[in-house]
Amino acid sequence: MDAPGDPEGPRPPGGDGPAGSARERLRRLSREQFYVLISAASVNLGSMMCYSILGPFFPKEAEKKGASNTIIGMIFGCYALFELLASLVFGNYVVHIGAKFMFVAGMFVSGGVTILFGILDQVPEGPIFIAMCFLVRVMDAISFAAAVTASSSILAKAFPNNVATVLGSLEIFSGLGLILGPPVGGFLYQSFGYELPFIFLGCVVLLMVPLNMCILPNYESDPGQHSFWKLITLPKVGLLVFVINSLSSCFGFLDPTLSLFVLEKFNLPAGYVGLVFLGLALSYAISSPLFGLLSDKMPHVRKWLLVFGNLITAGCYVLLGPVPILHIQSQLWLLVLILVVHGISAGMSIIPTFPEILSCAYENGFEEGLSTLGLVSGLFSAMWSVGAFIGPTLGGFLYEKIGFEWAAAIQGLWALISGLAMGLFYVLEHSRRRRRCKPQDILSTEEEKTALLPHEL
């Protein structure tokens, strides 16, 4: 089934087209495409609010219940580990299960377990509390993986020629979820206690379920012949996976560490700690649609966005503390400024990765359809989860051992290495293409001369 409103059928993203065609197609949205956007926006907003609500107050609450910083980091990190495993499964079987059913069921379970997280303060402290935190987070991770994998597949199917633009535009709602989650959670916690933030957000997500059941179109496709293994063993995809890992680990690193650092360093109340996260989320939400549009309109600039975005991110983490060897005094305004720059650099790096992987898959013989879109969506979600597991787990451990300043600098090394590796790959790829073009130019010149000789005689 071709994308609605696209008579030419799906084509690899980033293909040539008339100037302004991407913008024109987005103006001529069919009803189904409009409903897809609403559904994807709802899952982005709801899931990111549920994910980010923990930041301002949960680490402090967990400490009261007997959890160490390392355990708190693992509670954040286990979410990503099980999202990784679930994304690989759901991405491979999205055609068999059905994208719409996977989407709706994922949202329903996510809303329910968010409410369950709100009653964990009634659980006895110590091992029982820690075990229940892990159990509820794992259930939430699996449901979130189902909804997001299905959402990305449906979006790429509905908008085959504007993947980066649409994904980038919908990051507004992811950013809005990240923006609203911490301050809403912090102020509800400060005003009404531990339970209400989770119950409120869980109910909001559950209210979105019947809406999506009614409006989300049902896409069907035949199962494909390719596998995750073939996709991830492509050299370019392997490096893009490393980029995704590094960026998600940078975000995940901040979850268990930044709120504790701000509380200790600047003595802010829990409600205001959430506002510190605002700079990162707001700049990411605003910049992502712009980088998405740029990626679709000028596909050749994606490589530079990826490389420079990673290098800027590395610099941000060196200055986040800042690292002691720079002898720069830590100040709240500087921290917020660095988070704003990090949000922009993250948008530069994250948005081009999905269309780059999809283009690479098409170039290497993967069929165009929901099956390949499911593989790419599942791979993206799974590899994001790898970094999101390592980031908070390693971040919590390093924070405990060497402090936030050095831990952030070490985290920045990952982004630096991935940016340099991606840049080196693109340079080598460009030189290989130039060498390949030269013999073809020589052959075509000789053929032209041969064709002209009889006429000259």
Regions found by a protein language model. Give the residues of each.
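Cytoplasmic helix-loop-helix junction between adjacent transmembrane helices
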Residues: 134-174
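C-terminal ends and interior cores of transmembrane alpha-helices
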Residues: 108-126, 311-329
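Conserved MFS/SLC helix-loop-helix module at the cytosolic interface between two early adjacent transmembrane helices
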Residues: 85-124
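C-terminal membrane-cytosol helix-exit motif in multi-pass small-molecule transporters
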Residues: 202-221, 421-426
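Helix-to-loop junctions at the C-terminal end of transmembrane segments
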Residues: 86-98, 189, 288-300
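Residue-level signature of mid-helix packing/kink "hotspots" within the transmembrane helices
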Residues: 80-88, 178-179, 281-285, 289, ...
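Hydrophobic core of transmembrane alpha-helices in multi-pass small-molecule transporters
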Residues: 128-146, 331-349
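Extracytoplasmic gate region of multi-pass secondary transporters
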Residues: 54-56, 238-277
